[in-house]
């Protein structure tokens, strides 16, 4: 799934985990979310993701200072980790590529980093038993 700042703000990670866990309960039981491995792919990093006061305040209110620090920058990956933890996914099962799409624009596309004109990324996930 894709979770830009609006998706993170709207708890898309929690909703996705709960939806999958509901579907997996018959197979994995009530603790299904604790068995999930999560990969956080390339994204705008906190050093490059500067926001206005309104968005910053929303993130502080939602997730605390851990992901909305210094008054203007937001750490989207930390917001996602907080959400996943709340949904029952163990932090030890979350892998963050930690590649900033703005800083590494020769490797990745970035809407913000490229002034609104950019390409697209693709990813897929496979469940194995």
Model-derived regions, located:
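Active-site microenvironment for binding and transforming phosphate-containing groups
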Residues: 1-129
